[in-house]
């Protein structure tokens, strides 16, 4: 599967670099590195789109990705998460005061709705994916990240990836057909 991830990204994006990372965001998440022809599985997490769907079904009674995306786009994670500004009154290092300090730490069902809960779910999953990917990219001195799979189609998750990678001066690249990249990579 790791070869299919990288080969699919190469066939989808046609990168010019000899060294880059591919993030495959499916049911779980995987990071693979391409380095001058060599392919390495660099890590990942069991959190991904499957986690978003499972938690959404459990917490808000929805498991359709389009509905979850629509709900989360209207939600406010700050209604369910304690933010840095709530806990220590400001930013820490390069983390803004709006970063989550405690996922679901402010839950008050009288003050949040399905939209807020959906945003909190995607935020929690996205933070773990992002921290994993940033660590891998930093350790391996990666300058380009190509994102494939279907889970980046969640608007909030995609925004989190863009903002998070910006902190380490990397712009993640997405492709409208990125969800088919692994299939292309198996051919």
Predicted feature locations:
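Short beta-strand scaffold segments in enzyme catalytic cores
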Residues: 28-34
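A glycine- and small-aliphatic-rich helix-loop capping segment at beta-alpha/alpha-beta transitions
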Residues: 13-17, 35-40, 60-62, 161-168
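Glycine-rich phosphate-binding/hydrolytic loop that grips phosphoryl groups
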Residues: 3-12, 52-57, 64, 170-187
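Glycine-rich phosphate-binding loops at beta-strand->alpha-helix junctions
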Residues: 134-138, 142-164, 178-179
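Short, high-confidence coil segments that cap the C-terminus of an alpha-helix
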Residues: 17-18, 142
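Glycine-rich phosphate-binding loop plus the immediately following alpha-helix
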Residues: 38-89
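Adenine-nucleotide phosphate-binding core of ATP-dependent small-molecule kinases
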Residues: 93-144
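Short glycine-aspartate micro-motif
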Residues: 19-24, 44
